[in-house]
């Protein structure tokens, strides 16, 4: 058995004949296809529905010094979220795709929705505000995907929903800064 130094081993390895190795590089891209757009729309619809539930439960349970104004605002918010959910879902159907048939399927389309876990008004409304902003960013992404796919109806409705969500976040931020 021969003992070699590390330098000898490396030199032998460098001088050894080599074979050309072909490596395939796998690149994952988001193609602008109707299927991918619909997948994104169903996920966004799920998010809107869960946002509707969150706003509705906050509407019932929030207790704060400006309860009447917050209660009224949240009532309008959950109604808007439901209308936005309906709009996106109808657009999915207009593209000849199906929406999930049950609540489990709908919630599986967006699994990591941040839930309010406290009855503290400030904490609950702060999380809801963050969820509004996250939803608005999802709507922006949907606008871009719709533009790439050539779906101007989806693009326009998603832009409108984006505005609704950012406006709601702005109003809540102003409320949270002011009096709670």
Enumerate the predicted regions with their spans.
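Short linear clamp-binding motif
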Residues: 1-17
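Acidic, proline-/serine-/threonine-rich low-complexity intrinsically disordered repeat tracts
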Residues: 14-32
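Disorder-to-helix initiation segments
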Residues: 27-44, 114, 121, 125-128
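Helix-loop segments that flank and shape redox-cofactor active sites
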Residues: 33, 50-76, 138, 142-153
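A structural signal for well-ordered alpha-helices, especially hydrophobic packing surfaces
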Residues: 45, 52-55, 59, 85, ...
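Acidic/histidine-rich alpha-helical segments that form the ligand environment
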Residues: 58, 104, 108-160
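Conserved alpha-helical segments that form or flank metal/cofactor-binding pockets of metalloenzymes
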Residues: 68-105
């Amino acid at each position: 058995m021969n003992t070699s130094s590390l330098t000898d081993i490396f030199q032998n390895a460098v001088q050894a004949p080599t074979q050309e190795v072909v490596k395939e590089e796998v690149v994952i891209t988001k193609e602008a296809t109707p299927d991918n757009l619909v997948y994104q729309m169903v996920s966004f619809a799920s998010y809107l529905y869960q946002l509707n539930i969150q706003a509705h439960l906050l509407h019932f349970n929030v207790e704060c010094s400006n309860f009447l104004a917050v209660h009224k605002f949240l009532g309008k918010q959950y109604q808007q979220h439901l209308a936005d959910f309906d709009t996106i879902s109808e657009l999915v159907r207009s593209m000849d795709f199906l929406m999930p048939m049950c609540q489990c399927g709908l919630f599986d389309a967006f699994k990591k929705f941040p839930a309010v876990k406290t009855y503290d008004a400030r904490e609950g409304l702060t999380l809801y505000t963050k969820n509004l902003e996250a939803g608005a960013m999802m709507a922006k992404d949907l606008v871009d995907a719709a533009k790439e796919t050539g779906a101007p109806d989806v693009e326009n409705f998603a832009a409108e929903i984006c505005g609704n969500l950012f406006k709601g976040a702005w109003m809540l931020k102003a409320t949270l800064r002011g009096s709670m």
